[in-house]
Amino acid sequence: MNMEQEDDQVPAVAAETVPLKRYVTNPGANRDEEVAAAPSSQDTPYFDYAYERSLRHQDAKFLAMNGTQNGRDGLPSKSPRRPSVSASTVRNSDDVNHSKAGPGSGKLLNDTLQSKISSIHMPHVQQGDNAVVSSVGGPETDPGNMETTDPLFSDELAEIYLSIHKCMDMRHKYIRVSLQGELDNPIDDDSWIIYPDCKEGEDDTGLFNFADCKIPGIENEMEYHMDHQGIFQVYENDSAYIAGTPSFHIPTIRDYYIDLEFLLSASSDGPSKSFSFRRLQYLEGRWNMYMLLNEYQELADTKKVPHRDFYNVRKVDTHVHHSALANQKHLLRFIKAKLRKCPNEKVIWRDGKFLTLQEVFDSLKLTSYDLSIDTLDMHAHTDTFHRFDKFNLKYNPIGESRLRTIFLKTDNDINGRYLAELTKEVFTDLRTQKYQMAEYRISIYGRNREEWDKLAAWIIDNELFSPNVRWLIQVPRLYDVYKKSGIVETFEEVVRNVFEPLFEVTKDPRTHPKLHVFLQRVIGFDSVDDESKPERRTFRKFPYPKHWDINLNPPYSYWLYYMYANMTSLNSWRKIRGFNTFVLRPHCGEAGDTDHLASAFLLSHGINHGILLRKVPFLQYLWYLDQIPIAMSPLSNNALFLAYDKNPFLTYFKRGLNVSLSTDDPLQFAFTREPLIEEYAVAAQIYKLSAVDMCELARNSVLQSGFERQLKERWLGVDFQDIDRTNVPIIRLAYRALTLTQEIALVNKHVQPSKHPSNHDLEELIHKYDAMTGTSDPLSASPRTNDATISSRLSLHDGHDHGAFFPGLSVISERRRRKDSMASSSQDLKD
């Protein structure tokens, strides 16, 4: 057995340990002489290896004797210092649930899960003859509890725990201020009215009527103005604006970068990385053990559920771009149909005149017969790997930008009619499938203020409403392109163009009525572009947006902050007015710098891709603890940045991260008319996912999505744990909640007042230990004079059970004795 395995059996002590300054070379000699004789050139805080092993042998005796006294076959039994695992202790873990800010967090272990815990077979803690855990209460009984490590490392562990807790507190601060929490959005209230209200699978044609939409007016005197930092601030009235007192507190960019620097320092700290890596390895190993023991039980549970299987549980495509919503075959069939039915329709202005659709294809020297999948050439093959520039060209049918303008743009000479018709066909497919939902990303570029009104008019006029669909607004990070083209002068103009119309419509929806109605189906913002672009640090201190007038693009962290800050101010105002709020779900961790993940951890509700988390174990562990949503697209990554077999999706899933599957760009990556099912099918074949695994991923996608809470309850059950609706066995949900609860408790326990003995109490225990053994040398003590014997003697002596005696006391006793010896030796030298 190696040292680490032995350490796992020794509970830690929350007490200061003072490193030794001498190296023991002969553990068999008198130790007072050894300390005095040790050469000063070999100063070290550690014992000699053999000597330390002999010290720890005392603890091994304690564990063995404790097991043989009360249990069978040497298995440890319940003791006063190690409370038995029970459901009552599980209920005491509710205080850790506040640490979660992700969707569907709430109470991790409700009554349903607690009642099911006893059926989970996890023989990590042996109990008598059964040798099976009935339930797990907290970190004291968690087999992976780091408290059981050597007391020598308790101080270092405490610092790591505090660092983790501080990072989580920073995230919670930003999420709380921006109203991105689970129940912060008014749409999650039971009184929220969904219009048009139509169940999935029902024909929604003609249900939407813009005249039936209520458009409120101005409600109060609140005003908005952009401050000198580039943030739209909301004021109670003009007097508050003159006084410079905004209604809502927005974290400053200085505070943000200070917090970001701390997070980056913590993530690069060696001990923190090692600790996080070990915890993640433990979580993965625990999952493997769980599956070995419970796989067939899960299968039996799912077979008892009538009507439900993977195909008819709700699943949401949480990351898909609207301009690539249809696969190649669908787009090809649509283009051929238009060329056949309306060839003489004027579609584009070129060379001083309008061209018909037939004239456009004549100029390309193509006929309907010539068109094929290969001719379109929109699928991302091997030539796009690590070539994001080539991938962007795949959005052009036949390599022609004019065809993209005609068929895949909302703002063109035909007002985006072709794209609207294609979108309706996809909506029809979703309605037919009934159990599939999608959240489409649609672009606002920030080039001018009219973009919002044009987009809203396109949605409303074409009646693009579906009970299966919600929208996100993606903002491409293309300031450098706009600057070089002369479209904008400073970065502040981009920020103003993106957010000012939203503040206008929040103040008075009558100024942009169509935009007001459209925003009710918008759930958040996304930040998109090639993350692998180099980010040059041109300033020692970043200027405010009004002073950012160079041709270089701001870094990712800068972009994300100004999207977050303005969205935070907007959300606060919209919630006061009773309007829906937004979340930030950017593309992050697909390529480029891992620092992007730190920015997203602080500011965003969830991310897309996240494959670079595999390189930063500390951040990955934080992602697990806070259950931050990750929408992963292995097929997309396989074509662009990472081979499918190297994708960390399966590892994330095993460890318990909140992951879901999404399609990203069906036009470039999918071959079938059901791209989401295709994504699941490939993952199931490559990773050998079970039906329960896929149903759990589908459930995760619903929880990650921005659909209204009343819809989620209809799809998943009131507490999101109804096996009759999710087809996920309660035993699986109980395992996930149980493991997460213990990990959170492990961190929280070390930032609360310690229940372990103080330094003064520890001194008394050590002196009593020395006195009762009759010698200050643990090696010369009787084999039966161990921690258990000491504890029993003290109980007889003063009538109390001293649960503070623990395996490892001999080591601490030796360290304290040596410290005292060295102190007295130093004093003698001075005298």
From Swiss-Prot:
According to the record, the residues making up region (Disordered) are: 26-45, 66-110, 130-149
Which residues are annotated with the PTM Phosphoserine?
A: 79, 84, 758, 776, 780, 782
Q: Which cysteines are joined by disulfide bonds?
A: none
Look up the record and give one Gene Ontology term from the biological process aspect.
AMP metabolic process
Positions binding Zn(2+) in this chain are 319, 321, 587, 664
Matching entries from InterPro entries are given as: A/AMP_deam_AS (IPR006650), AMPD (IPR006329), Metal_Hydrolase (IPR032466)
Has the keyword Coiled coil been applied to this entry?
no
This entry's comment on the bound cofactor is:
Binds 1 zinc ion per subunit.
Q: Which reaction does it catalyse?
A: AMP + H2O + H(+) = IMP + NH4(+)
Per UniProt, substrate binds at 321, 390-395, 590, 665-668
Its required cofactor(s), as named, are: Zn(2+)
What's in the keyword line of the UniProt record? Cytoplasm, Hydrolase, Metal-binding, Nucleotide metabolism, Phosphoprotein, Zinc
E.C. number: 3.5.4.6
Kindly tell me the pathway this chain contributes to.
Purine metabolism; IMP biosynthesis via salvage pathway; IMP from AMP: step 1/1
Q: Which GO terms describe its cellular component?
A: cytosol
Please provide, alphabetically and separated by semicolons, the GO molecular function terms listed in this UniProt record.
AMP deaminase activity; metal ion binding
What is known about what this protein does? AMP deaminase plays a critical role in energy metabolism.
- Assembly and oligomerization: Homotetramer.
The name of this protein is AMP deaminase
